[in-house]
Amino acid sequence: MYSQIRTSMLDGICAMPVQVEVDISMGMPVFDMVGYLSPEVREGKERVRTALHNCGILLPAKRITVNLSPANIRKTGTGFDLPIAVALLVAMGLVKPEKCADTIFSGELNLSGQLLPVRGILPMVSDGVKEGIHKFVVPADNLMESRLVQGADVCGFSALESVIGYLQDGGYKEPAYAGRRQNRSHGMPDFSEVNGQQFLKRAAEIAASGMHNMLMVGPPGAGKTMISERMATILPPLTKKEQLEVSKIYSVCGLLADSRTLLQERPFRSPHHTVSMAGLAGGGRSIRPGEISLAHHGVLFLDELPEFSKSTMEVLRQPLEEHQIHLTRAVGSVTYPSDFLLLASMNPCNCGYYPDRNRCRCTQASLQRYFDRISQPLIDRMDLCVEAPMVTYEELTGNGNNESSKTIRDRVCECQERQIFRFKDEIFSHNSGIPAAKLNQFCRLGEKEQRYMEKMFHKLSLTARTYHKILRVARTIADTQKAENIRVCDLTEAVCYRSIGDKFWGGMEE
């Protein structure tokens, strides 16, 4: 007898439909599984056989063939256990085929027949609904995550026996804990906690307003990390579409901590400088998302930038330009989104006190080696390069009457709304994404402003790339002041955010 059941597998943060076919025919008693299977999928036949046995169901002494279609795509993951078991039950005549029609099954089985959660259930359900499938059967631990998708009729079960009962008589009892929500409360860091560093705070607001990448250079204890950790709190709230995109990525990684709601806060990722290329960009045997994808629609902070390996930092070049990462391995290729705001910090030298020669003991050669660790193309992709001086005693012990993150966020939201309206007919939505070909359209300069930039171009020996970055940042500065056109004062401030190149790199500008 033949049966067919719907399921799906992950392809990046999307779901690919898979058909589980079972044929039971006369012949030597054998249980074969075909369809380009990974080891964990192939091992599933023993989990399924034993789980059915412990539910009181014995497989017939016949030739059993299980095919996972399409056969040209490698199947990975443990979510095929449940659909294989259901397909066997249908083929054995224990469940009517119409009970499983237009339903997607997914779940892992243990030997006792208990259903275990699987990664990536959110994109599986979301893409299933897009394809017109609205009924899903999943493990109970994945139930709330599945119900985040509108239009999905999801049933969650904790054991295979419960699934069999549901398919045979249609009875469904909601798991006892399905309606409960975790009570999670935690205090978010706030900009009001940062004393001093007004120049650095201003640069951070501009970076957030235009989604400009920023590098901070300063001695230890200057507040670079404190400001970076609070950067996500001044970005606009995630839209519903962005919440779903970010939640899909975290679901694929099994990191959706509270499965009763989509992620509400913008991600903040700060990998250690020993992170591998696969850890940063993604990859591994099963091609998982890396830190740059986990920071999608949020902030990626690289503390102590020169301590990262040069090969690891080079991985950032493509995502910074294309806002996505293409990963290719022997088992296949996937694309993960990676549209993030990059923040990086570093000391000015190995000891941290250059150019203060009273405290710095680094030689000129060691200084050169220190800055040579950083890729020039990566530096070129930083829109703002800001110096963070030491905080004075007066600033540190002041009354602490600092602006809160909410106050700054309100200004950032207003600034970004101006950009979204301006670029409503374009494929980009922030000033940092203005292509060079459209700078004259969106960053038009008056005669006085042109004369100023011509003077700065020759005085600072600017490259075309740096000149364009200054215009984009100046456009954001003008937006923060609600100015229709770029003014000389906007250009002057934008130039200041590129002025540390000569101080620390000398010939940083190409």
Region spans (language model):
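Peripheral, non-AAA+ core regions of ATP-driven protein-machinery
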Residues: 1-215, 219-225, 328, 466-467, ...
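Short beta-strand elements
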Residues: 18-24, 280, 383-386
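Basic, amphipathic alpha-helical bundle interface domains used for macromolecular binding and assembly
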Residues: 37-45, 60, 67-77, 287, ...
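Catalytic P-loop NTPase motifs of RecA-like helicase/translocase cores
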Residues: 112, 302-309, 352
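Conserved alpha-helical scaffold flanking the Walker A/P-loop in AAA+ ATPase domains
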Residues: 205, 262, 267, 278-300, ...
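Walker A/P-loop
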Residues: 216-257
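Conserved inter-motif catalytic segment of the P-loop NTP-binding fold
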Residues: 242-276, 283-284, 389, 429-438, ...
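Walker B catalytic acidic pair
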Residues: 297, 303-304, 315
